[in-house]
A protein has these predicted regions:
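Short, acidic, metal-binding catalytic loop of nucleotide-sugar glycosyltransferases
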Residues: 25-34
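Conserved nucleotide-sugar donor-binding catalytic segment
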Residues: 9, 84, 140-220
Length: 270
């Protein structure tokens, strides 16, 4: 295995028998390996735990750590459980149905290790049909993101997150929709640095919304986003006028997403 860097990878697992191995393989193929890989089973109730044990046995003893939750708490709380146990200076999150470019950790860690004012980074993603040979990437240029941008738009997918282990904030416990965006808004509201690289270092295998998984429920996603703005408003981070304007813009985005899903469904029928 390649040289390791002080990064803990956390993968929340829920009934992911068909995709988990692909995600783990993408971590194993990193040019700079993470210090550890933490698999958190969110009370799947199927053979996911058996697969986790099999994967653990394939690699160096202690490199893959298993966390077995006895109640289903959702991805946000599962990520927190792994985060709290992480030993690395940084924590990277990967969803069980996604994967990474082989140089993701190398390039992201290099930036975070030097940018002491940044507590969270993310990067671009690309949709694939299957895990394949990745395009050669030699560098990733990270740029700071202003708070105004974070409020208007979720800047990157959760599978691109790398955070400082000692960050005080966590994903909102029990939240099952748009918890990643709320987390970023909280951090940005506190004046802490967030940066993004446009380079595609995460691979997804289905559309961001309108397909299998939690994101398929557009209305619940919409309610989650509206709740985010109201919570941030109540905390005094933004004004009432800003909340109203952001909610209006959110509904416009919802209409666009709904139209995209409708067109996609019509295309499949044809």
């Amino acid at each position: 295995m390649n040289a390791k860097v002080p990064v803990s990878v956390v993968i929340p697992c829920f009934r992911c028998m068909l995709t988990l191995e692909r995600a783990v393989v993408s971590v194993v193929r990193q040019t700079e390996l993470p210090q550890e890989l933490i698999l958190v089973d969110d009370c799947s109730g199927d053979d996911t735990r058996s697969l986790m044990v099999q994967l653990q046995s394939r690699y160096s003893q202690g490199w893959i750590r298993l966390v077995l939750l006895e109640t289903n708490v959702g991805a946000a709380s599962a990520r927190n459980a792994g985060w709290d146990l992480a030993r690395g200076r940084f924590v990277a999150f990967l969803d069980a149905d996604d994967a990474w470019h082989p140089r993701k950790i190398e390039l992201q860690y290099k930036f975070m290790d030097s940018a002491t004012d940044v507590v969270i980074t993310g990067h671009g993603h690309v949709q694939l049909n299957a895990l394949q040979d990745a395009d050669d990437v030699t560098e990733a240029e990270f740029q700071r993101i202003p708070a105004s941008y974070v409020f208007i738009k979720n800047p990157f997918v959760t599978s691109s997150f790398m955070v400082r282990k000692d960050l005080d904030f966590r994903f909102l416990a029990g939240r099952r929709y748009m918890e990643d965006h709320y987390f970023l808004m909280q951090v940005s509201s506190a004046g802490l640095g967030i940066a993004k690289a446009r380079t595609h270092l995460a691979f997804i295998f289905k559309p961001i919304f309108g397909e299998a998984g939690l994101s398929a429920d557009l209305l619940k996603m919409q309610r989650g986003e509206l709740d985010n703005y109201r919570l941030i408003g109540r905390a005094g981070s933004i004004s009432l006028l800003a909340v109203i304007l952001l909610e209006a813009y959110s509904w416009l985005k919802f209409c666009r997403r709904y139209a995209i899903v409708w067109v996609r469904s019509i295309s499949k029928v044809k």
